[in-house]
Structure formats: structure tokens, C-alpha cells
């Protein structure tokens, strides 16, 4: 990847814009004549819709339909070096490379873990442009803002060019949690959660009309039957933040597990039918002794506990 990619988004108002380097994110590059076709046969998203300017949220699944790793797929234009770049959890990048190489067979692709060279900067509450890296809008939900794939030592320069204040990664976590966006390894367990449980179907991470991908049969069946009983959902609390991993209880009955928590908001993997029963019976939900309340996010289209059908 060139040091300064000439790729930007439409400039806009940047008052109050913040940016944070995300140390938990890594980068895997897939390049070659067959790169798009190769990944499109594996990942949940339609990579035919990825362009230098439009990234896609996706995941690699087990044959049983569970998430091995989720990622944001961005593209570099041919004049800037070409290739598809996967913005993924850094701890899982080596495993992702290993898995992709397993499926490579005779495909004309080169797969590289570039996490030692490249990192990911998130920028939100504004828009801007920078030539210090590959800029793409976060495709998961409005409000998440931009992401910039770049050498980490250029983060301060990229933030300045964006017109953003460079802040700690913890500030981005507060923003992510406030928007109700799940984070793998904290809000759901990799290799144990289905895409629906991690809200990938709600956040543009699964294209049900594309061709085959690994685990498609299970995921499509869950979609058509509406059989996802568990989901990561936003919650609110007024007291001290509940600890991640504590059970969420409705009386003596466990209804889920607590995940992220920051600044009065959190995320929890909840069994929706049991939550609906608790709400109907006016039984409070408790996470480690802390009362929590489910809060419906703007992006949710699935039937919310207590509602009769999904939002139109």
C-alpha cells in the first residue's frame, strides 16, 4: 500500500470531530486476479458492492454458520496499488490468514497479515478527508463515522488533516456502545455466535441474495424462519457499570450475559422471549446486582421484546 493514498470522502463540517487509533484492530490484505471472487465465495457480504469508496461489513463463518471473524472490507484503487483490505480484530488476523490460505487452493491470490505495518483510525462526529491512508465510511450504522487504514505513526497527522481531535480509544468505545454496535470477543463469543445473534443481519453484514458462502444454509434458514432467539441488544443502567460476563437475571431466571458497558449504556446478549416475559410480568433485569433496561436502537428491524412485529 502506498504511504499516502489519494482517496477521500466528501468534505463536510468537522466541528467537534474526534479520532482515535484502535489498537485492537489489524489489517489483512488479499490481492491478485481472483481476490474478489475468492473472498466473495467465503464471506457473508456481497463483495461485488465493494468499491474504492464503499466498504462492506462481513464475516467468515464456520460450516455450522458461526462467526470465526468479522471484518470491514475496503478496496484500494488500481492506481494506488489495488487489493482488498480487511479491517479485522488484530488478535484474530493470523487465524484469518491461516483460514483464507486453507481455502485458497488454486486461486490467484496473495494473502498477507499487515497488522505490524498498518492500523485503523476511527473518526466520528464529522466528515473530512486525508491523504495519509485509505479512508472509508464505516458501513455498519449511521453515526459510526469514518475509518482510516494507515501506518499508526501517521495517526496524529491524519487526525489533523481530518480536522479532528485525536483522543484515546476509550472515547471510541463510549461512542460505539452508545450506538449499540456489538464488538466481538466482548459482546459475543467468536466461533459460538451466529450472525443474527451479533446483529450482523441488522448492520448490513449479511447479503442474503448473493451466491453461496460458508455457513449460508444455516444462516439463511435462521433468517427465513425468524428463529434467532438470542441477540446482542443495547441496555441502559443508572448505577455502577455491570462487569462484562456477569449473568443477566430476571428474578431467578437467567435471560442473558452482560457485555460492554460505558457511560450509562451497555450491550448484553439476551434471550428475547425471556426478556419479553420479564417485561410483561414487570420483573426487573439485573446484571451483577445492577438494574438494566433494554433500549431499542434506531437500526433494529427485528421484533423488540414486547412488540408484535419487526419495524417496517
Q: What residue spans do the PLM features occupy?
A:
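Glycine-rich, small/acidic residue-mixed loop/short-helix segments
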Residues: 198, 203-206, 220-312
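N-terminal amphipathic/hydrophobic targeting modules at extreme N-termini
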Residues: 2-6
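Acidic, low-complexity central loop/insert segments
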Residues: 19-20, 26-29, 72-182, 250
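Short, low-order "capping/linker" segments at domain edges
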Residues: 119-132, 181-192, 302-312
Amino acid at each position: 500500500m502506498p504511504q499516502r493514498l489519494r482517496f477521500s470522502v466528501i468534505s463536510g463540517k468537522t466541528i467537534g470531530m474526534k479520532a482515535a487509533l484502535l489498537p485492537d484492530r489489524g489489517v489483512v490484505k488479499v490481492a491478485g486476479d481472483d481476490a474478489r471472487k475468492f473472498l466473495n465465495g467465503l464471506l457473508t457480504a456481497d463483495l461485488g458492492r465493494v468499491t474504492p469508496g464503499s466498504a462492506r461489513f462481513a464475516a467468515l463463518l464456520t460450516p455450522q454458520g458461526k462467526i470465526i471473524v468479522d471484518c470491514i472490507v475496503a478496496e484500494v484503487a488500481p492506481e494506488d496499488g489495488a487489493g482488498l483490505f480487511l479491517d479485522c480484530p488484530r488478535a484474530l488476523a493470523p487465524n484469518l490468514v491461516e483460514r483464507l490460505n486453507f481455502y485458497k487452493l488454486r486461486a490467484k491470490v496473495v494473502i498477507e497479515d499487515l497488522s505490524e505495518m498498518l492500523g485503523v483510525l476511527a473518526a466520528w462526529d464529522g466528515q473530512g478527508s486525508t491523504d495519509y491512508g485509505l479512508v472509508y465510511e464505516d458501513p455498519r450504522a449511521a453515526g459510526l463515522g469514518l475509518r482510516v487504514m494507515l501506518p499508526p505513526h501517521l495517526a496524529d497527522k491524519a487526525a489533523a488533516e481530518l480536522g479532528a481531535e485525536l483522543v484515546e480509544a476509550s472515547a471510541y468505545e463510549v461512542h460505539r456502545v452508545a450506538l449499540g454496535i456489538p464488538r466481538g470477543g466482548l459482546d459475543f463469543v467468536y466461533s459460538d455466535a451466529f450472525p443474527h445473534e451479533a446483529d450482523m443481519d441488522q448492520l448490513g453484514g449479511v447479503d442474503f441474495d448473493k451466491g453461496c458462502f460458508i455457513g449460508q444454509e444455516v444462516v439463511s434458514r435462521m433468517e427465513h424462519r425468524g428463529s434467532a432467539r438470542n441477540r446482542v441488544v443495547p441496555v441502559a443502567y443508572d448505577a455502577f457499570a455491570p462487569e462484562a460476563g456477569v449473568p443477566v437475571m430476571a428474578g431467578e431466571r437467567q435471560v442473558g450475559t452482560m457485555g460492554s458497558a460505558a457511560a450509562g449504556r451497555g450491550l448484553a446478549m439476551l434471550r428475547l422471549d425471556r426478556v419479553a416475559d420479564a417485561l410483561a410480568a414487570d420483573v426487573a433485569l439485573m446484571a451483577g446486582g445492577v438494574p438494566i433496561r433494554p433500549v431499542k436502537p434506531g437500526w433494529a428491524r427485528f421484533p423488540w421484546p414486547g412488540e408484535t412485529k419487526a419495524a417496517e
